[in-house]
A protein has these predicted regions:
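Bacterial N-terminal signal peptides that target proteins for export
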Residues: 2-15
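Short, threonine-centered small-residue motifs that mark membrane-proximal processing/anchoring sites
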Residues: 13-31, 250-268
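N-terminal targeting leaders for non-cytosolic proteins
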Residues: 30-131, 135
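Terminal, low-complexity interaction segments
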Residues: 34-38, 171-256
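Short catalytic/ligand-binding loop motif for oxyanion handling, primarily in non-cytosolic enzymes
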Residues: 41-43, 148-153, 235-238
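Extended extracellular/luminal ectodomain segments enriched in beta-structured repeat modules
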Residues: 135-142, 224
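Short coil-to-beta strand junction motifs in C2/discoidin
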Residues: 155-178
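C-terminal membrane-anchoring or membrane-association module
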Residues: 273-282
């Protein structure tokens, strides 16, 4: 009767071969923390990059961090000397307690997840939902999500464009929801909902607007090659959503999904090693 140690041997060999031959597969968990990005614009509250290359031209190429692609569209209007952007920006702004549109690049926690200096800001406007592309199939474990300072104070206090969540009585059943959709090619695999604010509780003391980094489990999305981020709110008007269409993101943890041929090769090698070892023992 083979011992437990004998049965574990092939698995050990598979992991060893994986580490040596295929370091980019599921052996490692890759993390995008935006620490490798270095092109910045200087804002009143700190450094950020929103697609502006500094040459008064439009740019829709997006940008990458740790090999992962982030959608971004920056438009510069030469006639009116005006610019606007949408998609993803990355930021080093540390101004989580300042409200208003001028502070659109700040995460409410003030720093990145775990106190890091860098994080990403998503703004869903002009060109639609923000998108992340991985270039190959991956399994995403989790993403850290929070509100931006701009959206947070808009919901908590209201402003000239948006209502105070809960209304004057505090009883309005408002919410601000982020839906994260996984795609494999053009096929949606699944979706995960995360509430950036939720005022639907019967007990108003349970109402909340997220102000800290929160880890969102995305394992249910399965094997994917892209993520789409959609925002919705109960505060809507003639021109769409009134709530500022922003959220902050950090620490994308994922692993590449091995190609079937690679898995078969590793399995055959492990089985061959184990059979040979058993034969020599006899």
């Amino acid at each position: 009767m083979p011992s437990a140690r004998d049965w574990c041997a092939p698995r050990t060999l598979v992991l060893s071969l994986c580490l040596v031959l295929f370091p980019g597969l599921l052996c490692y968990g890759d993390i995008v923390g935006f620490e490798d990005n270095s092109l910045y614009s200087q804002g009143s509250n700190g450094l950020y990059y929103n697609g502006d290359l500094g040459n008064n031209t439009s740019n829709s190429q997006g940008w990458k961090s740790n090999g992962v692609g982030f959608s971004n569209s920056y438009t510069f209007d030469n006639q009116y000397n005006y610019s606007y952007w949408s998609g993803f920006a990355y930021s080093r702004v540390n101004a989580g307690n300042d409200s208003g549109f001028q502070n659109q690049y700040a995460a409410k926690p003030g720093t990145g997840s775990g106190g890091s200096a860098h994080y990403a800001i998503a703004y869903n406007a002009f060109v639609g939902d923000s998108i992340i592309t991985f270039g190959a199939q991956v399994q995403v474990a989790s993403i850290d999500i929070s509100n931006t300072a701009y959206a947070y104070f808009s919901m908590k206090e209201g402003d000239q464009f948006s209502k105070k969540f809960g209304g004057a009585s505090g009883n309005d059943a408002d919410f601000f929801k982020l839906r994260i959709l996984g795609f494999r090619g053009a096929t949606e695999t699944a979706a995960v909902d995360f509430f950036l604010a939720d005022y639907r509780f019967e007990n108003n003391t349970q109402d909340y607007v997220v102000d800290q980094w929160t880890r969102v489990d995305l394992t249910s999305l399965g094997a994917i090659d892209s993520l789409k981020f959609a925002l919705s709110s109960t505060d809507n008007g003639q021109f769409g959503m009134n709530t500022p269409a922003y959220f902050a993101m950090d620490r994308i943890e994922f692993s590449a999904v091995p190609e079937p041929g690679s898995v078969a090769l590793l399995s055959m090698a492990a089985l061959g090693w184990w059979v040979r070892k058993r034969t020599l023992r006899r």
